[in-house]
Design a protein with these regions (language model features):
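Active-site neighborhoods and metal-handling regions in enzymes and metal-associated proteins
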Residues: 1-236
Length: 236
C-alpha cells in the first residue's frame, strides 16, 4: 500500500548512491524499470539494498570526510553503530532537510489534497448509499463484500492507484477490535441493525486519503447510542 520504495540514499560531493532492492521488481513492471533507467541516465548510481552498510564503512574510512549529516529518527541501530564506532567525530545529527521541506506543502500539493478528499468523499458517500439501500432491499452482504464494493467506487475516480491501506470493514463486535482484519472467507454478515465501521483510504496521483466512518445500519441499542454520541462529542 506504500507507493514509496524502502531504500537508502547516500549523497556525497561527487556521487548519488541509491540502495534499493532493484531485483524485487517484477519483470512485467516496465514502468518502474523505465524509472530506474532514467535515474541512471541522470547520474544516480543504483546499488544493492544490503550493501549500504559496507558502503558507509568504506566512506567513513576515507580521510577526506569532514562531515556526514544523518537523521537519527530514520537511521537503524546497525548503521548508527558503524558511524558511532568509526566516524563519531564527523557525524552531524539533525532532522532531514528533505523531510522538513516536504512538511511544508506548496499550492499544487494543497490543491491535490483537497481534490483527493472531495473525490474520495463522493466515493464513500456512494458506497454508504449503496450499502443502506441494498440492506433495506434484503440483499445479503458481508463485511468483505462491502469492502470490495467500496474499492469499485474508488476505482472509478481518475488517478486512482489503489487503497492507501487495507480496508477495515467491521460490523458489530468486530468494530471494537483495533486494526481488525476483514477475512475474505467467513466474514460477518451485515444486518439492518447495529453499528458498522469502515476505515479505509485511497491513493491518487494528486493525493492520499484516510477516512473512518461508523454508521448505524438500523435500530441501535441504548448503549450503542450513548457510546456513539460520546465519541462524536469528543471529536467535535
Amino acid at each position: 500500500y506504500n507507493p514509496v520504495v524502502m531504500s537508502y540514499l547516500l549523497v556525497t560531493q561527487d556521487n548519488v548512491l541509491w540502495f534499493v532492492r532493484k531485483g524485487a521488481v517484477p519483470e512485467e513492471d516496465t514502468e518502474t524499470e523505465d524509472s530506474f533507467h532514467e535515474l541512471t541516465a541522470d547520474g544516480v548510481s543504483l546499488q544493492e539494498y544490503s550493501d549500504v552498510g559496507l558502503a558507509l564503512s568504506n566512506l567513513v574510512d576515507g580521510s577526506y570526510i569532514k562531515a556526514l549529516f544523518v537523521d537519527p529518527s530514520t537511521l537503524n541501530y546497525d548503521l548508527y553503530s558503524i558511524l558511532n564506532e568509526n566516524a563519531s567525530q564527523f557525524v552531524v545529527m539533525g532532522a532531514s532537510p528533505v523531510a522538513l521541506r516536504k512538511s511544508v506543502k506548496n499550492e499544487v500539493e494543497v490543491a491535490g489534497m483537497r481534490e483527493a478528499h472531495l473525490e474520495d468523499g463522493v466515493a464513500v458517500e456512494r458506497f454508504l448509499h449503496w450499502l443502506e439501500t441494498s440492506l433495506q432491499a434484503g440483499d445479503a452482504i458481508n463485511e468483505y463484500e462491502a469492502s470490495v464494493k467500496l474499492h469499485e467506487f474508488r476505482s472509478g475516480i481518475e488517478g486512482f492507484r489503489g487503497e492507501s491501506f487495507e480496508t477495515i470493514s467491521a460490523y458489530g463486535p468486530n468494530a471494537a477490535l483495533p486494526h481488525y482484519v476483514t477475512p475474505e472467507e467467513g466474514s460477518a454478515e451485515l444486518y439492518t441493525e447495529g453499528l458498522y465501521l469502515c476505515d479505509s483510504g485511497g491513493q491518487y496521483l494528486f493525493g492520499t486519503t484516510d477516512i473512518t466512518r461508523t454508521v448505524p445500519l438500523g435500530p441501535c441499542s441504548q448503549l450503542e447510542k450513548e457510546d456513539y454520541t460520546l465519541v462524536l462529542k469528543g471529536h467535535i
